[in-house]
Amino acid sequence: MLGITAEDLVDIMDIRCRIEGLASYYAAKNVSPEGLARLRHILDLQEFYFEKRDAEHLREMDDQFHDVICDMSGHAVISDTLVPLHRKTRRYRKASIADTKRTAQVVREHRAIFDAIAAGDADRAAALTTEHTIHAKESMMGRLKNHG
């Protein structure tokens, strides 16, 4: 994306690490059958699209997974903060999802985050989401370094 420097990307991803973890923390605290059903459906679709190697739909499922967690958190300010940050990093996120090895890791990480939220384990959900976002940051930084 034009206007995003390596320094900007680091800043954005560092902020996302904190806020995404917080979103998952609150989602686990506010867990509902409806929210879990939405996440489970997204995970099932994500696994389906992974098997089909459909990068565009995988990116959409990745977006939806994080959006639903934001909704489940019950804190509008979390969504209001994260949506613009996701938009700013879309190009790098899309390239990252196109990498089969990274996508397999994303699917596993999303499943673990879901399990923690479903169990109501807020601390574990936050830690797993933070770790997931750190991995995304590393992948994006690698893409930026190698492809500009």
PLM features per residue range, with description:
Residues 3-7, 108, 127:
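Charged, amphipathic alpha-helical coiled-coil/dimerization segments
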Residues 134-144:
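Short arginine-rich
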Residues 26-34:
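A eukaryote-biased feature capturing mid-to-C-terminal, repeat/solenoid-rich segments of large proteins
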Residues 117-120:
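Short acidic-aromatic low-complexity motifs
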Residues 1-17:
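HTH-adjacent hinge/linker in prokaryotic transcriptional regulators
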Residues 12-18, 33-94, 109-114, 124-135:
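Conserved amphipathic alpha-helical segments that form helical-bundle/coiled-coil interaction surfaces
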Residues 5-6, 92-96:
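Short alpha-helical transmembrane interface motifs in multi-pass membrane proteins
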